[in-house]
Swiss-Prot record:
Belongs to the major facilitator superfamily. SotB (TC 2.A.1.2) family. Involved in the efflux of sugars. The physiological role may be the reduction of the intracellular concentration of toxic sugars or sugar metabolites. The lineage of its organism: Bacteria, Pseudomonadati, Pseudomonadota, Gammaproteobacteria, Enterobacterales. This is Probable sugar efflux transporter. It is found in: Cell inner membrane. Keywords: Cell inner membrane, Cell membrane, Membrane, Sugar transport, Transmembrane, Transmembrane helix, Transport. One of its GO terms (cellular component) is plasma membrane. The keyword ATP-binding does not apply.
Length: 396
């Protein structure tokens, strides 16, 4: 076995470790979607009231991503990952012990703090540790961790919550994070901060219209997605009239389809990212517009969820690739902004879905989400024609 072979295997193992970490972080972000009813019952609240926790979490991440990234810009990355995992684990212990909804929200804010730092550095670390010529595949592997959070983490968290209580779901995530932390300590080398940028990077980034256009596209399309996705569980049960088990299966199917999207992007993203993203946004638009009509059939909803999951994974990967390509001199700052903007979209979508459900009808969340999806489609066509260069090649 050659040294080069060993090095490539070690490199992939490190990327896999980051992908597992991504799975852990995204599981805890997504899992409340499947636990809203149980948490609401525990604290004698309405489901829509508990749902505001999703917006609080997302907007804390959005608000703190850039400040935390700047504060830690010179910190060695292995040490930083260890510290943020400690905060992450401690916050989940507090979630397990929560004696009131306020305490639960406080614990989730602690998780959001760790999240804010994690996603501002993970994509650039994955690219940095990937074998030569395999950077797009490394990003796809990280995205696969995200998809597995939906296909395995969210349904398993929901099942644990149903049988053992929602507190045990958060405790189990904390245990998983502890195991992941031990793996990080064992496998990761010292990772001095590189190309992290600083506050001085912001004016330079803001003067890049292509990058700003990608940020705007991101917040609009994520808002569209989360307007419907945040309340997909009660939609399936209360509007479509299907069972709780089918709701779990639908979440499983949507997440699994995300893995398909990750594979597609890994194979075609190097050459066709712009076309893939615009096509995926169009697919998302169709899925949202057909959500209510599809609610009359389990098969229709199942097929729709497959295309929905594929679309969102391609969109997420495409946005990351373009951000990294447009800011190679300040990747951490650019990704901190991306993480913050992405979470603005999550919070906005969850809030819109909340308000539609409370003051109009939950049956309308798909139609309402389709409005920003249509705007995102038009914007993507405009900006990809304005900047037609195959940006993703710059990250190779």
């Amino acid at each position: 076995m050659t040294t080069n072979t060993v090095s490539r295997k070690v490199a992939w193992l490190r990327v896999v470790t980051l992908a597992v970490a991504a799975f852990i972080f995204n599981t805890t972000e997504f899992v409340p979607v499947g636990l809203l009813s149980d948490i609401a019952q525990s604290f004698h609240m309405q489901t829509a009231q508990v749902g505001i926790m999703l917006t609080i979490y997302a907007w804390v991440v959005a608000l703190m991503s850039l400040p935390f990234m700047l504060m830690t810009s010179q910190v060695e990355r292995r040490k930083l990952l260890i510290c943020l995992f400690v905060v992450f684990i401690a916050s989940h212990v507090l979630s397990f012990l929560s004696w009131s909804f306020t305490v639960l929200v406080i614990s989730r804010i602690g998780v959001a703090f760790a999240h804010a730092i994690f996603w501002s550095i993970t994509a650039s670390l994955a690219i940095r540790m990937a074998p030569a010529g395999k950077r797009a595949q490394a990003l796809s592997l990280i995205a696969t961790g995200t998809a597995l959070a939906m296909v395995l983490g969210l349904p398993l968290g929901r099942i644990v919550g149903q049988y053992f209580g929602w507190r045990m779901t958060f405790f189990a995530i904390g245990i998983g994070a502890l195991v992941t932390l031990l793996c990080l300590i064992k496998l990761l080398p010292l990772l001095p901060s590189e190309h992290s940028g600083s506050l001085k990077s912001l004016p330079l980034l803001f003067r890049r219209p292509a990058l700003m256009s990608i940020y705007l596209l991101t917040v609009v399309v994520v808002t569209a997605h989360y307007t419907a996705y945040s309340y997909i569980e009660p939609f399936v049960q209360n509007i479509a009239g299907f069972s709780a088990n089918f709701a779990t299966a639908l979440l499983l199917l949507l997440g699994g389809a995300g893995i398909i999207g990750s594979v597609i992007f890994g194979k075609l993203g190097n050459q066709y990212a712009s076309a893939l993203v615009s096509t995926a946004i169009a697919l998302l638009l169709v899925c949202l517009a057909l959500l209510l009509p599809a609610a009359n059939s389990e098969i229709h909803l199942g097929v729709l969820s497959i295309f929905w999951g594929i679309a969102m994974m391609i969109i997420g990967l495409g946005m990351q690739v373009k951000v990294l390509a447009l800011a190679p001199d300040a990747t951490d700052v650019a990704m901190a902004l991306f993480s913050g903007i992405f979470n603005i979209g999550i919070g906005a979508g969850a809030l819109v879905g909340n308000q539609v459900s409370l003051h109009w009808s939950m049956s309308m969340i798909g139609y309402v989400g389709a409005v920003p999806a249509f705007a995102a489609l038009i914007w993507s066509i405009i900006i990809f024609r304005r900047w037609p260069v195959t940006l993703e090649e710059q990250t190779q």
